[in-house]
């Protein structure tokens, strides 16, 4: 039976209509069931297998289905009844074909799937088919009894173990869907995964940044201060204040160290007061100079970037010199200085806070004030150092010996005691000093007079040079005036000559124009006469040509008339000749007719004679039949008739 069902050639011998219909219907049912089983197996394999198998199955579905259908449908031969009545499909002889269909269908499906799937996916496809074989057979048996309809996706009923496994994996296993939906879902899942990763990263960053952003009271104060300063300050001013505050702290810490409390020297109270007053002034000026210097350096760093480390070193050196000078001050003074330093530091910090609101215009004023402060501090430093470094009388050194006495002027006590050698020496020395001073003053006066004389001489020389220069300038001016007059006279002469030449040229142009006008008139008259003569000549020529043309026309007309006459005569002759020829032809025709009549008559006569002779011959043959046996002559001419001898 299986051979009969799956035979490629249809059984036309038994019952043609029934066999055609049953074989066609059975094969059609087989193709439909195989397709449905293949689609179900591919869907479940897509659900349980990886995405790679899905992508491989996409390429092989349509081609494999078409190949399987084409293989089975190649040898079908549809009858005329089926073409006329396609709706009357009767499922006859189904009992014979059902068992064979169920037996052979899994093999065909497995073969088609092996053709579709790649080598690496064969085991997975075979497993999926083996799981779905039993259910496919039951479904096919039910479907063969019914009419074929469009496929509806049915939910697969699994075993208890499979149900348990599915219950555990319900949260991640999707329901079976078409391939296009699976592809779209995979793309959407990738996008959702990327979005989940981004949200997780953002949450982690927020968690990490949360503890760092917890507010503290110190932080709140700092932020409030920063906001207040940032509202009042430009970015350049903020740089200035930071640099100024740091530099002030360093330099003030270096300059006002506790080592400044040195040993006090033995001085008078007035000198100590003056020294304290000067030192306090110098310290205040120094602080102002430091603050102004560092403000200017900060501005220059932020704007021009031209302040170097040498300025800082010089300022440190100045501070060290000041500290060396201040080591001789009393401890009370050092305490007062420390108090003043603290107050000045607070004042300077307040000043820096106020200066933060000031912009670039006040930085120039700060530079000027810093320069003046530096000059003032240098003067105060010089004064204080000169006063402090003056040695007292009590502590003066005695290494000069008795030469110091010479510098002292003789007092009343010394004048009372003139015998002492030191006093004599001092008096002599003082007289010599007075004479020397007088001499020096005289020499200085002489030098001053000489310098004045030299100055006067130089002034006189300069005046003489100026007078000479003025005289030379006047002479040069007079020479230039003469030359200018000469040049002006030359220019006037040149202008006169130019005017004369222009007038002469104008007169020549006028004469030339008059001559040209005359020549033009003559030329026009000549051309008019020439044109008139040419016109007359052309007229005469035209008349001659017209006459010649008229003569030629006359000659032509006469020639044409003669030719026409000749032509008419020639045509008349031709007509006459044609008439003569016609007559001759008619005569010939008449002669021919006569000859034909004569020939016909002669022919008729000849025929009559011939008939007569034939009759005579026939009669003679009948009469003399016995003479036929006699030998004929060896040759007889065809035109001549040989008569037999009559006995």
Swiss-Prot record:
Protein name, entry field: Microtubule-associated protein 9
InterPro entries documented for this protein: MAP9 (IPR026106)
Extent of Basic and acidic residues compositional bias: 133-145, 187-200, 268-287
Organism encoding this protein: Homo sapiens
GO cellular component: astral microtubule; axon; cytoplasm; mitotic spindle; mitotic spindle midzone; spindle midzone
Keyword Acetylation set for record: yes
Reported function: Involved in organization of the bipolar mitotic spindle. Required for bipolar spindle assembly, mitosis progression and cytokinesis. May act by stabilizing interphase microtubules.
Composition bias type Basic residues, residue spans: 174-186
Lineage of producing organism: Eukaryota, Metazoa, Chordata, Craniata, Vertebrata
N-acetylserine found at: 2
GO BP field: mitotic cytokinesis; mitotic spindle assembly; regulation of mitotic centrosome separation; regulation of mitotic cytokinesis; regulation of mitotic spindle organization
Protein location: Cytoplasm; Cytoplasm, Cytoskeleton; Cytoplasm, Cytoskeleton, Spindle
UniProt GO molecular function: microtubule binding
Phosphotyrosine modifications at: 12
Region (Disordered): 127-323, 344-421, 491-514, 530-553, 580-600, 613-647
Biased composition annotated in UniProt, kind: Low complexity: 365-374
Quaternary structure annotation from Swiss-Prot or TrEMBL: Binds to purified microtubules via its C-terminus.
Chain intervals with Polar residues compositional bias: 155-166, 210-219, 239-249
Gene name, Swiss-Prot/TrEMBL: MAP9
Alphabetic keyword roster: Acetylation, Cell cycle, Cell division, Coiled coil, Cytoplasm, Cytoskeleton, Microtubule, Mitosis, Phosphoprotein
Coiled coil: 184-210, 298-328, 443-628
């Amino acid at each position: 039976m299986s051979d009969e069902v799956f035979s490629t050639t249809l059984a036309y011998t038994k019952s043609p209509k029934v066999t055609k219909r049953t074989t066609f219907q059975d094969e059609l049912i087989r193709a439909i069931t195989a397709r449905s089983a293949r689609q179900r197996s591919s869907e479940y394999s897509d659900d349980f297998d990886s995405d790679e198998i899905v992508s491989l199955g996409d390429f092989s579905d349509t081609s494999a289905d078409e190949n399987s259908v084409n293989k089975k449908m190649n040898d079908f031969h549809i009858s005329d009844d089926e073409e006329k009545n396609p709706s009357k499909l009767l499922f006859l002889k189904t009992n014979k074909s059902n068992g064979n269909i169920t037996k052979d269908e899994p093999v065909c499906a497995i073969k088609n799937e092996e053709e579709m799937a790649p080598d690496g996916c064969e085991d997975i496809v075979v497993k999926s088919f083996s799981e779905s074989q039993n259910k496919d057979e039951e479904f096919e048996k039910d479907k063969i009894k019914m009419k074929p309809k469009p496929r509806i996706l049915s939910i697969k009923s699994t075993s208890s173990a499979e149900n348990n496994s599915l219950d555990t994996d319900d949260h991640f296993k999707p329901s079976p869907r078409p391939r296009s939906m699976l592809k779209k879902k995979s793309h959407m899942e990738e996008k959702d995964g990327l979005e989940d990763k981004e949200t997780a990263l953002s949450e982690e960053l927020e968690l990490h940044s949360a503890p760092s952003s917890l507010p503290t009271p110190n932080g709140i104060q700092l932020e409030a201060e920063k906001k207040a300063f940032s509202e009042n300050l430009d970015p350049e001013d903020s740089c200035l204040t930071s640099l100024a505050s740091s530099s002030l702290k360093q330099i003030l810490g270096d300059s006002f160290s506790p080592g400044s409390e040195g040993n006090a020297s033995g001085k008078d109270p007035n000198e100590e007061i003056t020294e304290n007053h000067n030192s306090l002034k110098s310290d205040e000026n120094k602080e102002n100079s430091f603050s102004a210097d560092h403000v200017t350096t900060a501005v220059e760093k932020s704007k021009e970037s031209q302040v170097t480390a040498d300025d800082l070193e010089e300022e440190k050196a100045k501070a060290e010199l000041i500290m060396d000078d201040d080591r001789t001050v009393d401890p009370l003074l050092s305490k007062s200085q420390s108090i003043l330093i603290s107050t000045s530091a607070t004042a300077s910090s307040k000043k820096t806070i106020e200066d933060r609101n000031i912009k670039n215009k006040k930085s120039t004023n700060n530079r000027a004030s810093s320069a003046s402060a530096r000059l003032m501090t240098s003067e105060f430093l010089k004064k204080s150092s000169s006063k402090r470094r003056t040695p007292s009388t009590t502590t003066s050194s005695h290494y000069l010996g008795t030469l110091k006495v010479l510098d002292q002027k003789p007092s009343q006590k010394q004048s009372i005691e003139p015998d002492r050698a030191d006093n004599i020496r001092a008096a002599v020395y003082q007289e010599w000093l007075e004479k020397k001073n007088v001499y020096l003053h005289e020499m200085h006066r002489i030098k001053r007079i000489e310098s004045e004389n030299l100055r006067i001489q130089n002034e006189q020389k300069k005046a003489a040079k100026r007078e000479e220069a003025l005289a030379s300038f006047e002479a040069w001016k007079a020479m230039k005036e003469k030359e200018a007059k000469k040049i002006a006279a030359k220019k006037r002469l040149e202008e006169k000559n130019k005017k004369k030449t222009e007038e002469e040229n104008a007169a020549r142009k006028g004469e030339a124009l008059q001559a040209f006008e005359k020549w033009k008139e003559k030329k026009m008259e000549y051309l008019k006469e020439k044109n008139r003569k040419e016109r007359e000549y052309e007229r005469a020529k035209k008349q001659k040509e017209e006459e010649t043309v008229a003569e030629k026309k006359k000659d032509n007309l006469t020639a044409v008339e003669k030719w026409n006459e000749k032509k008419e005569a020639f045509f008349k002759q031709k007509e006459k000749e044609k008439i003569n020829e016609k007559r001759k032809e008619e005569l010939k025709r008449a002669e021919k007719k006569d000859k034909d009549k004569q020939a016909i008559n002669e022919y008729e006569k000849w025929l009559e004679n011939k008939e007569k002779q034939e009759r005579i011959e026939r009669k003679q043959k009948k009469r003399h039949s016995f003479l036929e046996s006699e030998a004929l002559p060896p040759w007889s001419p065809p035109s001549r008739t040989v008569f037999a001898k009559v006995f």
